[in-house]
């Protein structure tokens, strides 16, 4: 069997930074260290940090006053920040810097009274945090997921609009929705191209590059990982059978009946150790040749807060 490993795959700079923030806080301060929401959407990573003394909560009312709390890579609303300050919580912010860029755009629109449209998935913590940057009743913030949502959208002033996107969506994910917005609202302002999350786009490009060369695609990532699900969907759109697995235990040998070529990748929140375990499990099924497929080099590094260095 030929096993192709897509590149780049796995941890991005934002995930590396978020995990490092929790690890350094655990080293420098006595547990418990509270983390609002899963710091990244991966079961293995979260369990590892729990075992070391991190306590994951969904709301700040689960955190004792004057405790240390870390905001997840997905970001939080302004209301959450205000509550943390009011209660005297010591905050370390693990929000991905690329998410923060989107937050600043929404906050700027709010200050200017420009209505803002967010392209994203309802219920995702990043979406909730981004929409929570807007607090100007003179304008408004709207969430759309599809061209149909755009068709049904009603705004106050069609000539005073901007849009932003959830960072775990690539340009390809949002093309149709953006086209619908620009068709309906010709004067709408969008983000600059350099605001696109490089990691999301690179991992999707890597899947696209490999998908047509294999009969089966395995994506390593947790079910609540938005970007991992997008990778699986992209492989399927290319006509390749694809499965999302948390770890090697999820790999079903029946998937490989008659398969000669399989590809493996990992979402941005999945560690390489899980990829290795999955590849090892596949290689045990038949004599295998493992090939690293060349891809775009990533050298972005995001620094942790100065107090944790």
Curated annotation (Swiss-Prot):
The lineage of its organism: Bacteria, Pseudomonadati, Pseudomonadota, Gammaproteobacteria, Alteromonadales. It is an enzyme of class 1 (oxidoreductase). (2E)-4-hydroxy-3-methylbut-2-enyl diphosphate binds at residues 41, 74, 124, 167, 225-227, 269. Pathway: Isoprenoid biosynthesis; dimethylallyl diphosphate biosynthesis; dimethylallyl diphosphate from (2E)-4-hydroxy-3-methylbutenyl diphosphate: step 1/1; Isoprenoid biosynthesis; isopentenyl diphosphate biosynthesis via DXP pathway; isopentenyl diphosphate from 1-deoxy-D-xylulose 5-phosphate: step 6/6. Catalyzes the conversion of 1-hydroxy-2-methyl-2-(E)-butenyl 4-diphosphate (HMBPP) into a mixture of isopentenyl diphosphate (IPP) and dimethylallyl diphosphate (DMAPP). Acts in the terminal step of the DOXP/MEP pathway for isoprenoid precursor biosynthesis. This is 4-hydroxy-3-methylbut-2-enyl diphosphate reductase. The active site is at residue 126. InterPro entries: LytB/IspH (IPR003451). The gene is ispH. Its EC number is 1.17.7.4. It catalyses: isopentenyl diphosphate + 2 oxidized [2Fe-2S]-[ferredoxin] + H2O = (2E)-4-hydroxy-3-methylbut-2-enyl diphosphate + 2 reduced [2Fe-2S]-[ferredoxin] + 2 H(+); dimethylallyl diphosphate + 2 oxidized [2Fe-2S]-[ferredoxin] + H2O = (2E)-4-hydroxy-3-methylbut-2-enyl diphosphate + 2 reduced [2Fe-2S]-[ferredoxin] + 2 H(+). It comes from the Bacteria.
